[in-house]
Amino acid sequence: MTIIRKKHPLIKIINHSFIDLPAPSNISSWWNFGSLLGLCLIIQILTGLFLAMHYTSDTATAFSSVTHICRDVNYGWLIRYMHANGASMFFICLFLHVGRGIYYGSYNMIETWNMGIVLLFAVMATAFMGYVLPWGQMSFWGATVITNLLSAIPYIGTTLVEWIWGGFSVDKATLTRFFAFHFILPFIITALVLVHLLFLHETGSNNPTGLNSDADKIPFHPYYTIKDFLGVLILLMAFMILTLFFPDILGDPDNYTPANPLNTPPHIKPEWYFLFAYAILRSIPNKLGGVLALILSIVILAFMPLLHTSKQRALTFRPITQTMYWILVADLLVLTWIGGQPVEYPFIIIGQTASIAYFAIIVILMPMAGMFENNIMDLD
């Protein structure tokens, strides 16, 4: 078996990636989320495949086909709710994974980090298009509002929006193409994940100290396979509790009403995992400014290696920047809350303050804290 594992052209790639991979001896549970994201992706592809067997991407029958899946297909209700809540679990793992990367300075592995940002955009695009497919009220109006943002692009905006819609409004052509893209994107994401791993294995994993761990490596299997398996069990338990006991807790009741272009819902909002970005978008009165802020809220992650001023990699031994980090986490929770609130006083001013704080912490306060820590520890 060892000979096959180490000599076979295909199996040896798996061996070098998941079995004999040298890993730091001290990586904590925060390093579990990579494998959990892989599990989420597999769950989403499998449940999505079974849903696609019964779904019809036509405005007249899309809503009915989802109802049919839930009522008439064997365990269709389970597959549908696993897919819907699987997206939420995916984003929870994604946010924790990115948060870990920021905390421990993993963004210094620039190729891996940038590929991660591309993956984040791809997953967000996939989730947005997936939310449109059941063709409920929030599906339709969410698609209308978000795609309409592209009309803020000077000169070509309106043409671009109509090109994406395939007409003069969100209609059958839009739904059909969104289904096609929603189906193909997870496979593109899988390919990008392999590139992400390829870049990671070029440098090796980071660790909680932020120090070079070449002198103290252990094989990935069995140490981290068993550790990842524990993470998998915990995730599956949380996922099953969410899916079987509270399937609709993260959804919007408006999406149980079929799409009606003549009736606008009182509060149009995206799924919970986009609310922080939606709050940043709404905090700027100008349409183009809002769109730029929305894009920048994610793109700013790509500038983190440039904004790193500390002589230390991780925040483990940096209490001042740690404080800034946790204020940033709290700020993102505030933005998520504000994104789900109506556009009225006092929510507008809270959203604007939280948006300014978000960019200020990343661009100004954390780099300044890094320089200050260098000074007080004489690391110049």
Curated annotation (Swiss-Prot):
Give binding positions for heme b b566: H97, H196
The entry's a ubiquinone-binding residues are H201
Gene3D superfamilies from the UniProt entry: Cytochrome Bc1 Complex, Chain C
In terms of SUPFAM superfamilies, this protein maps to: a domain/subunit of cytochrome bc1 complex (Ubiquinol-cytochrome c reductase) (SSF81648), Transmembrane di-heme cytochromes (SSF81342)
- Give the matching PROSITE patterns: CYTB_CTER, CYTB_NTER
What is the free-text note on the cofactor?
Binds 2 heme b groups non-covalently.
Please verify whether the record's keywords include Ribonucleoprotein.
no
Gene Ontology terms, cellular component aspect?
mitochondrial inner membrane; respiratory chain complex III
> Which key words are in the record?
Electron transport, Heme, Iron, Membrane, Metal-binding, Mitochondrion, Mitochondrion inner membrane, Respiratory chain, Transmembrane, Transmembrane helix, Transport, Ubiquinone
Q: Which cofactor does it need?
A: heme b
Topology in membrane: Multi-pass membrane protein
Q: Where in the cell is it found?
A: Mitochondrion inner membrane
GO function terms (MF aspect): metal ion binding; ubiquinol-cytochrome-c reductase activity
Q: Name one GO biological process term.
A: mitochondrial electron transport, ubiquinol to cytochrome c
InterPro entries in the record: Cyt_b/b6_C (IPR005798), Cyt_b/b6_C_sf (IPR036150), Cyt_b/b6_N (IPR005797), Cytb/b6-like_sf (IPR027387), Cytochrome_b (IPR030689), Cytochrome_b_C_euk/bac (IPR048260), Cytochrome_b_N_euk/bac (IPR048259), Di-haem_cyt_TM (IPR016174)
Please share what else the UniProt entry notes about this protein.
Heme 1 (or BL or b562) is low-potential and absorbs at about 562 nm, and heme 2 (or BH or b566) is high-potential and absorbs at about 566 nm.
UniProt family annotation: Belongs to the cytochrome b family.
Q: What does this protein do?
A: Component of the ubiquinol-cytochrome c reductase complex (complex III or cytochrome b-c1 complex) that is part of the mitochondrial respiratory chain. The b-c1 complex mediates electron transfer from ubiquinol to cytochrome c. Contributes to the generation of a proton gradient across the mitochondrial membrane that is then used for ATP synthesis.
The name this protein carries in UniProt is Cytochrome b
> What's the source species for this entry?
Microtus guentheri
What is the name of the gene encoding this protein?
MT-CYB
